[in-house]
Every structure is written in structure tokens, then in C-alpha cells.
Amino acid sequence: MAQTTTLILLLATLLVAATTVSGQGPHIPLAPSPSVNEAMNCAAGLAVCLPAITQRGPPSQECCTAVETALTTQLSCLCGFIKSPMLLIPFNVTDFNALFSKTCGLTTDPNLCSETAAQAPLPKTAAPVPGAPKSDKDAASKLAGTGLVGIVVITIAAMFY
């Protein structure tokens, strides 16, 4: 029962943090934001790693495969966990990247989610026109997408407990 409560608390914390971050004022994204489908796939894929995080045991092969997949196809989602270590502090995990790269045998660049690495693959765009900042017309859809992902993750977690 305590494990279920802890898991739901973790997922709720992740949802609140993600909603707060995506609801902040205009910003320049460092890495391309994942679409709702990509975020749902990433969160669902990494859900297999929760036992390794909560029980502090070695991750399963399924978890290692999910992290490896996220490294190659869903980097912006994985960087969200790597760049927000405060989300995992209740589980005494301070370095998400080190936890899985060491135990899964994955070799990752320590600067994988740094500003320069995250900006490198972005296509060149025209410089913004000086003047008043533009309003973020997609803010509501970002908040709705984040909330939807959170609800899906919490529902999936609740189904297994």
C-alpha cells in the first residue's frame, strides 16, 4: 500500500511540475518540445523503470531497453528527467542519467542535455523582429497536453496497483 501511495505521489508531483514549467511565460525551447503522443509514449515507456527507482534495485532489461529507446528517439522527454533531478529526490535518486547509464551499460555524453547539445539539432530560423514580446498562443494547448499526459500516466500506474 505504501508503495502504491508513493508511486501516485511521484506521478502527481511530476504532473504538477510539468504543468508549472509549461505554463510559465514565453521562452525559447532548448530542445524541440515533444508532441502529446511522443510525451505519452515516453512516459509510458519509462514507467517500467519505476520499480528500479522506488525499490533502489537494478533496473530490469525492459527498463534498460526503454531508456535506450528514449535516448535515441525521445531525447527531449528523457532530458526532462535528467534536467529536473528534484522530481526524483524523494526516492534518493539525484542523478537519473548516472543511475541508468551505469546499471544498464549505456554510454551517454554528460553534455547530452546541455544547452549547446540541445540546440545543435535545431534548424536555423529567422531572427525575431525586435519589439513587444509575442504572446504564446499555444500555452493552453501545452497545459492541456501536459495534463493529459499526467492523467494517462497516473491511470496506467493505478491499473497496475
Curated annotation (Swiss-Prot):
Signal peptide segment: 1-23
Ribonucleoprotein in keyword set: no
Alphabetical list of InterPro entries matching this protein: Bifun_inhib/LTP/seed_sf (IPR036312), Bifunc_inhib/LTP/seed_store (IPR016140), LTSS (IPR043325)
Propeptide: 139-161
Compartment(s): Cell membrane
Membrane topology: Lipid-anchor; GPI-anchor
Glycosylation site residues: N92
Annotated S-S bridges: C42-C79, C49-C63, C64-C104, C77-C113
Top-rank lineage group of the source organism: Eukaryota
GO CC term (a single one): plasma membrane
GPI-anchor amidated aspartate lipid sites: D138
Keyword terms of this UniProt record: Cell membrane, Disulfide bond, Glycoprotein, GPI-anchor, Lipoprotein, Membrane, Signal
Family: Belongs to the plant LTP family.
Role played: Probable lipid transfer protein.
Name used for this protein in its record: Non-specific lipid transfer protein GPI-anchored 24
Gene: LTPG24
